[in-house]
Structure formats: C-alpha cells, structure tokens
C-alpha cells in the first residue's frame, strides 16, 4: 500500500497554477465574474439604480431626438450638402447610435445583468464602445477638416464626396473593430487574474489601451484647435496694423476662442472623469472606483447629447432649419441665400474668412 501511494502522480503547486491560469470560463455565469472582481451585482432595484436608469433613459431619448433632428436638417436643406455637413451628419448618426446602445444598456443593467450570458454581456459593452469610439473619431475628423479649411482660407474644403465616404467608412470600421476586440479575444475569460473591477469580463490591458487611445485623441484635438487659434490670432494682429477695422478682428478672435472653449470644455467635462476612472481601476486597486462608475458613464454619454448643440445649433442656418422642421414649415428657397444666415461650414469659419478676405489686400 505504501509503494502504491508513492507511485501515484503528484501535481506540484507551480504546475497547478499554470493549469489554472490557462483555464477558460466561457460557460460561467455573469455572477461568477462579478463576485470574483468584487463588483456588486444587484438582485433587486434600489433607489439609486432606479434614479440612474431614469436619468439614462431621459438622456437617451434626448440624444436620439436631437441627433435625428440634425440628420433631417442636413438632408432637407441643400445648403448643407458640403463635406463638413456630411461629417456632421455622420457625427449625428454616431451619437444617435450611442443613444440606442445606451438605451439597450439601461434595460440590461442592475438586476437584469444576471440574466446575461458571456456573449450578450460582451455585446452590450461592445455596442457602447463602438458608438462612443465613433463619436470621438468623428469629433477628430471635424477638427482636422476645420484645421485644413482655415489654413487654406476656404469656406468649404475641396474634398470630393467619394473621399468623404471613405472617411466615414474608416471611422465606422475603426469603431466596430474597437468595439469587437474584447469579443474576439482581448478579454479576461481565459486570464481570470487580470479582470477589471469596473468591467469584470474585460482585461485590464484593454481598458488601459482604450482609455489612452481616447486621451491621445483628446490631446490631438487640443493641438489642432490651439494651432487654429494661434494662426487666427496672428492673422488678426497683422490685419489690425494694416486696417481700420480692429473691432472685427477682435470679434473674430473671440468667436474662435468661444468655440474652442465650448468644444474642449465639453470633451473634458464629459470624457476625462470616465477615462481617468478606467486608469485608476487598473493602477489604483485601493481606490473605490465602483462608487462613481455609473454616474461617470452617464456623464460621458452626455457628450453625444451636446455635440448637436456645439456643432450645429451655433450655425444660424441650422437653427432656422430646426425651427422649420419643428414647426412643419417648408423651406421656400432651399438653394438661395438667406439674409443673416451663416452659410459657411461653421459660424467660426465664416467669421475667420470674412475678416481675412476683407483685409487680405492690406496684409499681403
């Protein structure tokens, strides 16, 4: 008996650990991952969950209606049939999709999370990642377009419709890939020791990558708008020395500054807290990030609600089209100019070009 017991195979502790690390948990319940990460999984609706869900649904409805209004306005008004407006329509489409994705999340959160499988949970998160990535990519595309337009002194870029379509396809391809990456393998289902606390099926490394990707995009936008501001400020100062219209130059610079502050301020307020929270989830285990998760996610979603206001409502022509649509009025002169309307790609670009072109002979 003693000899038999000595001859039986014994698995050492390092071998057991290696086998455990290679094990995958595709058939486990969502509760398994949540319990292991320490994230609370509700069994019933409490006051906070109901409040978050109510706010979330309200924001979703506003996002979808506001962005639908933008898309309809660009479609019905032929003055908007230019590349910049096509990008704005695509931004509205991305934000509309964000509203749908977040709406789906609202009905599959809280106690309803327990009913999800691994695949449906990854789908739920993938929709959010795809929609938000598409929105951010569109913001970057618009910033690049504005940069090119201002530096070439054009009302509209000379980009062909085909190139606009290519840009839009690239944006959505990148967004879909970013949203699908966790589902196709970059998750912690087979690496259970490196699961995130905020997203218990997501790998820590993916969340760090996603957060840094968006923060880098933010930095690029800051650089682009800062470059535009510096360029216009230099031009207005040169024009002030050679022209009798310093007030117009000052107004142009202030209009640009206001737009830059709105754009960057909205992005900082809506996105930075959530992105920092993702990094803290990985880099600061003792930080109680789960206490703020839902509210910061809701705040990030507000960016999709603010985009139509920032990029569309400041345009006088867009505002007039909004009123016509909401009041069921016909646009009697869809091709002609409207007095007092801003027919440029944005009111910002129109004021820049108006100041530059009216004084260009004195600068050169």
Swiss-Prot record:
Alphabetical list of InterPro entries matching this protein: GPCR_Rhodpsn, GPCR_Rhodpsn_7TM, LPA_rcpt, LPA_rcpt_EDG2
Tissue and organ expression note: Detected in brain corpus callosum, medulla oblongata, cerebellum and sciatic nerve. Detected in heart.
Main location: other
Residues annotated with Phosphothreonine modification: 351
Cytoplasmic side: 76-83, 145-163, 226-255, 316-364
Phosphoserine found at: 341
Membrane topology: Multi-pass membrane protein
SUPFAM superfamilies (UniProt xref): Family A G protein-coupled receptor-like
A single GO molecular function term of this UniProt record: lysophosphatidic acid receptor activity
Modifications after synthesis and translation: N-glycosylated.
Record keyword Signal present: no
One Gene Ontology term, aspect cellular component: dendritic shaft
Short name of any one Pfam family annotated for the protein: 7tm_1
UniProtKB keywords: Cell membrane, Disulfide bond, Endosome, G-protein coupled receptor, Glycoprotein, Membrane, Phosphoprotein, Receptor, Transducer, Transmembrane, Transmembrane helix
Membrane-crossing segments per the record: 51-75, 84-107, 122-144, 164-184, 205-225, 256-280, 295-315
Signal peptide: none
Glycosylation (residues): 27, 35
Disulfide bonding pattern of the chain: 24-190, 188-195, 284-287
Protein residues bound to a 1-acyl-sn-glycero-3-phosphate: 39, 124-129, 210
Subcellular localization(s) per the UniProt record: Cell surface; Cell membrane; Endosome
Extracellular-facing ranges: 1-50, 108-121, 185-204, 281-294
Protein family membership: Belongs to the G-protein coupled receptor 1 family.
Subunit-level organization: Interacts with RALA and GRK2. Interacts with GNAQ and GNA13. Interacts with CD14; the interaction is enhanced by exposure to bacterial lipopolysaccharide (LPS).
PANTHER family attached to this UniProt entry: G-PROTEIN COUPLED RECEPTOR (PTHR22750)
Protein purpose: Receptor for lysophosphatidic acid (LPA). Plays a role in the reorganization of the actin cytoskeleton, cell migration, differentiation and proliferation, and thereby contributes to the responses to tissue damage and infectious agents. Activates downstream signaling cascades via the G(i)/G(o), G(12)/G(13), and G(q) families of heteromeric G proteins. Signaling inhibits adenylyl cyclase activity and decreases cellular cAMP levels. Signaling triggers an increase of cytoplasmic Ca(2+) levels.
Entry protein name: Lysophosphatidic acid receptor 1
Organism encoding this protein: Rattus norvegicus (Rat)
Higher taxonomy: Eukaryota, Metazoa, Chordata, Craniata, Vertebrata
């Amino acid at each position: 008996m003693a000899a038999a017991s000595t001859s039986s195979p014994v698995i050492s502790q390092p071998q057991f650990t290696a086998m455990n690390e290679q094990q995958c948990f595709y058939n486990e319940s969502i509760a398994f991952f949540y319990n292991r990460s320490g994230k609370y999984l509700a069994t019933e609706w409490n006051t906070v969950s109901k409040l978050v869900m109510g706010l979330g649904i309200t924001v979703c409805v506003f996002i979808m209606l506001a962005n639908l209004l933008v898309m309809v306005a660009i479609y019905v008004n032929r003055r908007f049939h230019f590349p910049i407006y096509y990008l704005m329509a695509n931004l509205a489409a991305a934000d509309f999709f964000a509203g749908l994705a977040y709406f789906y999340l609202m009905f599959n959160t809280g106690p309803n999370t327990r009913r999800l499988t691994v695949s449906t949970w990854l789908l739920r998160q993938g929709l959010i990642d795809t929609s938000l990535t598409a929105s951010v990519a569109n913001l970057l595309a618009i910033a690049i377009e504005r940069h090119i337009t201002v530096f070439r002194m054009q009302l509209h870029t000379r980009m062909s419709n085909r190139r606009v379509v290519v840009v839009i396809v690239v944006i959505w391809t990148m967004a879909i890939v970013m949203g699908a990456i966790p589902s196709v393998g970059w998750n912690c289902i087979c690496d259970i020791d490196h699961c995130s606390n905020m997203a218990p099926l997501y790998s820590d490394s993916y969340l760090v990558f996603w957060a840094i990707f968006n923060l880098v995009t933010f930095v690029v936008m800051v650089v682009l708008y800062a470059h535009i501001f510096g360029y216009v400020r230099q031009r207005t100062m040169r024009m002030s020395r050679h022209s009798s219209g310093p007030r117009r130059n000052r107004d142009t610079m202030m209009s640009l500054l206001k737009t830059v502050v709105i754009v960057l301020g909205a992005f900082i307020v809506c996105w930075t807290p959530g992105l920092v929270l993702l990094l803290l989830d990985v880099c600061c285990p003792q930080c109680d990030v789960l206490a703020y998760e839902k509210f910061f996610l809701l705040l990030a979603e507000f960016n999709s609600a603010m985009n139509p206001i920032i990029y569309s409502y400041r345009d006088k022509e867009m505002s007039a089209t909004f009123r016509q649509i909401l009041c069921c009025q016909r646009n009697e002169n869809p091709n002609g100019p409207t007095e007092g309307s801003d027919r440029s790609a944005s009111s910002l670009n129109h004021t820049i070009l108006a100041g530059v072109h009216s004084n260009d002979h004195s600068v050169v």
